[in-house]
């Protein structure tokens, strides 16, 4: 007998939907709302944190979304090596802060924030980075604990395309349609 814990998106969708649906709405507001951070950077942060946490399912989807939004061929570099990443210089301190939020939140110092603010970002961006990291950590925990396997390349590209076209609301609609079958 397969327990709900192991490898099934249905476990998340069916048994936890009453509260998971609210989280999807939160993700829609957090990740898709127009702010000083472009959506591709938000998705890159989510992918980066997911990679650090060993959640290949989330890393792959969010990296694909970021890549498609950025229209660059190589999404791995920013996720593995911040200093040599092929992104604008102003976004590197953002990824460094995200790393500290994920790895050792108490290690954050004023200089980390100042490095971001010097590029013209406001303090709302700091809160946004922290919130994206928290959202990624939560989803990584849910996905890894349920032992959900990464999608294959075709499914991953399709999921990224759906997320770009329909947002997290599209994900919610998809999950509801599957639940109602």
Model-derived features: where do they sit?
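Amphipathic, charged-and-aliphatic alpha-helical interface segments
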Residues: 47, 89-108, 130-133
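Short, thiol/selenol-centered motifs that function as redox-active sites or metal-ligating centers
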Residues: 11, 45-67, 132-136
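Short acidic alpha-helix initiation/capping motifs at coil-to-helix transition points
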Residues: 18-24, 56-58, 102-111
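Iron-sulfur (Fe-S) cluster-binding segments and ferredoxin-like electron-carrier domains
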Residues: 20-21, 59-76, 149-151
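Secretory/periplasmic and organellar redox-cofactor proteins
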Residues: 8-9, 110-126, 135, 139-181
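Immediate flanking context of iron-sulfur cluster ligation sites
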Residues: 34-52, 124-127
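Single conserved hydrophobic/aromatic residue that forms the stacking wall/gate
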Residues: 1-7, 11-12
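Short, charged low-complexity linear segments at domain edges
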Residues: 20-41
């Amino acid at each position: 007998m397969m327990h709900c814990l192991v490898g099934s998106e249905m476990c998340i969708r069916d048994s936890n939907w009453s509260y998971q649906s609210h989280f999807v709405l939160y993700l829609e507001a957090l990740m898709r709302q127009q702010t000083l951070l472009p959506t591709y950077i938000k998705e890159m942060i989510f992918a980066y944190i997911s990679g650090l946490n060993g959640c290949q399912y989330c890393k792959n989807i969010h990296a694909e979304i970021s890549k498609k939004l950025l229209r660059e061929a190589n999404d791995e570099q920013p996720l593995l090596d911040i200093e040599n990443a092929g992104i604008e210089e102003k976004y590197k301190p953002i990824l460094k802060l995200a790393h500290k939020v994920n790895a050792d939140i108490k290690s954050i110092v004023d200089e980390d924030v100042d490095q971001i603010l010097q590029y013209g970002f406001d303090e709302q961006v700091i809160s946004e980075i922290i919130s994206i990291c928290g959202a990624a950590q939560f989803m990584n925990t849910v996905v890894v604990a349920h032992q959900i396997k990464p999608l294959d390349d075709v499914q991953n590209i399709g999921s990224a395309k759906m997320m770009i076209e329909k947002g997290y609301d599209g994900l919610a609609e998809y999950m509801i349609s599957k639940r109602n079958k």
